[in-house]
Design a protein with these regions (language model features):
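Gly-rich Lys/Arg/Thr-decorated short loops/hinges at beta-loop-alpha junctions or inter-strand turns
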Residues: 121-130, 155-157
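Short, compositionally biased "basic patch" segments
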Residues: 106-125, 139-140
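PLD/PLD-like phosphodiesterase catalytic module centered on the HKD motif
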Residues: 13, 17-94, 101-108, 134-299
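Active-site core of PLP-dependent enzymes with the aminotransferase class I/II
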Residues: 2-9, 170-173
Length: 299
């Protein structure tokens, strides 16, 4: 959270108004350790139940769970929140992020399970909708890529669009190379580190776009064509070893068709951008897209 956080103040106000509030505080937060400790102590004094980091495991997920109950303690409608960005007002002003706030029962139930994991109440969780790193994220990702490969083998188009901050994990890069060789059309929007080499014989169907503009592109959005019934996901992890193997990360599917179309339109707009965007070539150089005579597209 920010040093003077409205989120933090709202949580304290909720606790003082008789709400049961639990906050997981990740202490291993670059440059924010001291502030996180001080904030956690203030929340504890306000009656908030504080859960600190799990030793040897960083939690990078950006999630929240709201459970509404009646006077008898019976659960009413509940809500889950999954975001690509932190609860930080300072960075929220300059980072471009996406969040989902939903009452979908399966996602809410999965979120309850995730918080049980953070409380160390569950060690082998099962998730129906959420993709959680260290549990079901990697197998599901590989299955999604394989689905696109299978579609191409059936003579149908395979399509993948991935937006992230960094692409570094060699195992997942190899999965994308395998999909490219099978004929899946792949577009990547990668702001930072990109260890995938596009434009070679094994990656001829992969294009990499980089956008650097006024706001920092921080969202992680994944699109899979799925034979004309697209699957879209948002979440916290980049495709780096530390995110996929050594942290708790949370990814949610976007189940509402209108929201899926909105995110798909955003991805297509960013792929068409040429004013503040560039290609990444097979030497990993930035090649500006903007050319004289072309209409400017700023995404």
């Amino acid at each position: 959270v920010a040093e003077h956080s409205e989120v933090f103040n709202a949580l304290i106000a909720a606790a003082r108004n008789g709400k049961h509030v639990t906050v997981f505080v990740e202490l291993k937060a670059r440059f924010d350790e001291e502030n996180n400790l001080a904030t956690a102590e203030l929340m504890r004094k306000a009656g908030i139940d504080i859960i600190f980091s799990i030793p040897g495991l960083k939690v990078h997920a950006k999630v929240a769970l709201i459970l509404r109950k009646n006077d008898k303690g019976e659960r009413l409608r509940s809500y889950a929140y999954v975001s690509t960005g932190n609860f930080n007002e300072k960075t929220a002003k300059i980072y471009a992020d996406i969040a989902l706030y939903t009452c979908n029962k399966q996602i809410v139930d999965d979120m309850c399970t995730l918080f049980k994991v953070l409380r160390k109440e569950v060690t082998e969780p099962r998730f129906k909708r959420l993709l959680i790193a260290r549990f079901n994220l990697l197998p599901e990702l590989k299955a999604l890529i394989q689905r696109e490969i299978d579609l191409v083998k059936e003579g149908k188009p395979g399509r993948i669009i991935l937006k992230m901050n960094a692409l570094q994990d060699t195992a997942m890069i190899d999965e994308l190379y395998r999909a490219s060789e099978a004929g899946v059309q792949i577009d990547l929007i990668v702001r930072g580190i990109c260890c995938l080499v596009p434009g070679e014989s094994f990656s001829r169907n992969i294009r990499v776009t980089r956008i650097v503009d006024s706001f920092l592109e921080h969202a992680r959005v994944w699109y899979f064509g799925n034979g004309g019934d697209p699957l879209v996901f948002i979440g916290s992890p980049d495709w780096m070893r530390r995110n996929l193997y050594r942290r708790i990360e949370a990814v949610t599917p976007i189940l509402d068709g209108r929201l899926r179309r909105e995110l798909t339109d955003m991805l297509e707009l960013q792929l068409s951008a040429n004013r503040k965007a560039c290609w990444v070539d097979n030497q990993l150089r930035n090649i500006f897209k903007r050319k004289p005579g072309n209409d400017d597209v700023r995404a």
